[in-house]
Amino acid sequence: YSTAPLDTFRNLLEQQLALLGIPVTVMAVEELWQEEETLSERLAAENLQEDLEKDPVLLYGKLFSGSYEDLWDLKKLAAAKAALASFREAGSGVLILWGYGALCDTLRPLCDQKIYLDTTPMRAMLRLKRGEYRNIGTKKALAFKRMARRCYYVDFEVAAKLRFTLLHEKQLDSYVIANDALSMSLLPASLLEGIFARAMEYPLRCKPVYLEGVWGGYYIQRLRGLPREMKNCAWVFDMIPMEVSVVFELNGRKLEFPFYTLVQSQGPKLMGKRSVDAFGYYFPVRFNYDDTYHSNGNMSIQCHPGEKYVTENNGELGRQDESYYIVETGQGARTYLGFQKDADVEEFIAEARRSEKDGQPVDYQKYVYSIESKPGTQVMIPAGTIHASGQNQLILEIGSLTVGSYTYKMYDYVRKDLDGNPRPIHTYHGDQVLDRSRTADWVDQNLVNGGRRTLRKGKGRICGGRA
C-alpha cells in the first residue's frame, strides 16, 4: 500500500539472502513510470485541476479511474515483463521485483512469491507529513497538502484497487503488517484470511483516531483520558472507514490492520449481501463525534454536495448526507440548520464571498437558522443543507460518503487554523449545491427529530409475564 516502507523490507530480504549465499537481482518498478512532466500534466488535466477561483487551496479533484499500469510507460512495462520471463528461464538466484504496483495484473503472473506490505491510514499520513513518501511518478516529495491531495485522488485509489484484487482473488502468498518500519510482521496469506474470518464471528470496534481542531472541545479528551499535550479534541473518528484500523490479538501479540483491508477481505460477512449488491465493497456508513464542548467557537457554516455534483466533479459513488445526534450540551448550545424564514440567501452568499476577500466578519445569525440543542435530539442534514454544530456540545455525526469528505465551508468566522493559516473557504462549490428552499419552518417540520412524524401506530401490548 502507498507509503509502506518497501525499501526497508527489500533491504532486509537482500541481507538474509546474502547470508545464505544466494545471488540477488533487484528490479524496481519505479523505473516504469511515465516521464514525470508528462504524467503530472495528464493528472493535472484529468484529476488534479488547479482552479484557484473554485478551489483556493487545491483540496479537491477527481478520482483516477485506472490502475497502476495506466500510469506506466507501456514500452518500459513490456521490457520489464520480458526481463522477468527471461530470468525465470535462465537466471540464477533470486530476482526481487519491488515497488508500488509490482503485483499488478501484467507482472504478477511472473512472480513465484507474492508479498504485500500494508499500513494503516494514520501511519500513511504521518509518513506523508514527514516527507517519507514520493507520489507516483515524482522524483522528490511534494509539499504536504499537494502530496496528500494527489495521494487521495491517485496513489491511494490505485493502491486500494490492487489490494482488493489481491485479497479477493486470493493472489497473495504473504502479507506484511508494515505500520512500523522497525517492527514489521509477516503472515502467511492463509493466516491473514483466517484471522479476518474469525473476527466476523464476534462484535468488533475500530481503533479510534483523535484530531485537534480550531473549534475543538474537551468532553472526549477528559472522558477517554486523552494526552494532556493535545490542544483539544475536535474530531473523534470512531468509524471513518478510510481513517481507522482494527487490532486483533493472536497468541498474545497485537496485530493492527487497516479497517478497509478487512472490508475488502470480508465484505459480504461484514456488511451483508444487500449492502455489497448495492454499494460493492464500499462501507456505506460512517460515524464520528464532533466535540465543541467548552470550545472557543462553532464549527464552520457549511454544506455538502448531492449525488450528481459529486459524481460528475469528483468521481465519487454518491451524495453526502449527514445527521447529528446531540449527546451532551453546555450552556447556550445551539445547532445551526437551514436558513432563517425571510433570509436573503443570495445576500448571504455575497457576504460570505466578501468576507473571504476582506477578512471582515459576517452576521451569519441574520441568515442561518438555529435550534436549541438538547441531549437526545437528532437532526437530519440532507445534502445541500446549510448547517453547523454550535459551540459547547458533543454530537454524534452519522453520514454517507464514507471515504472522501466534501465539506464546503461557506463561512468560518474569519478564523485561522492551528498553524496560523486562514481556513479554506469554498463559496464556489457551496453556491452550486446549496438548497435555498430549506428555511426555518421546513427544517422544523422535516429535519428535527424526524419531523416528529408518526411512522406507525396501533394498540399497545404488554409482552412477557409481568408489566
Where are these predicted regions, by residue range?
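Gly/Ser/Thr-rich loops at beta-strand to alpha-helix junctions
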Residues: 1-8, 33, 100-104, 385-387
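NTP-dependent small-molecule kinase module
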Residues: 6-21, 122, 130-133, 153-218
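Intrinsically disordered, low-complexity linker/loop segments enriched in Gly/Pro
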Residues: 328-382
